[in-house]
């Protein structure tokens, strides 16, 4: 699966996603829609910093709730995805969809 195909699949299965960025193992953007760009990966870095303060390993996923949107970040098989969704998006489904997209990308490599 190409990164562009992964984005298309995500947008097809979830009408609640507004923006998505997919990242390779080095942290480079491989595909994005909605203008998230490389800075979006910082959400995982911030979550890792918080985990480290608590003596925990790096996070696999995180969610940030804002009044007007939810932000989701996921790591899977060395890849990462960050998405902005409507505030009423179902977190479990968004995490599942992002993880499946990353698995598809990892399997194609």
What are the residue ranges of the model-derived segments?
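Non-catalytic interaction/Regulatory regions outside core domains
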Residues: 1-25, 29-109
């Amino acid at each position: 699966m190409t990164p562009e195909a992964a984005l298309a699949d995500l947008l097809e299965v979830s009408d609640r996603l507004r923006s998505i960025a997919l990242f390779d193992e080095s942290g480079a953007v491989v595909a994005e829609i909605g203008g998230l760009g490389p800075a979006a990966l910082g959400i995982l870095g911030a979550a890792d910093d918080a985990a480290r303060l608590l003596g925990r390993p790096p996070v696999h996923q995180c969610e940030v709730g804002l009044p007007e949107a939810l932000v989701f970040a996921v790591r899977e098989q060395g890849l990462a995805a960050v998405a902005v969704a409507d505030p009423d998006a179902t977190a479990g489904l968004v995490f599942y969809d992002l993880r499946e997209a990353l698995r598809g990308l990892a399997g194609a490599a």
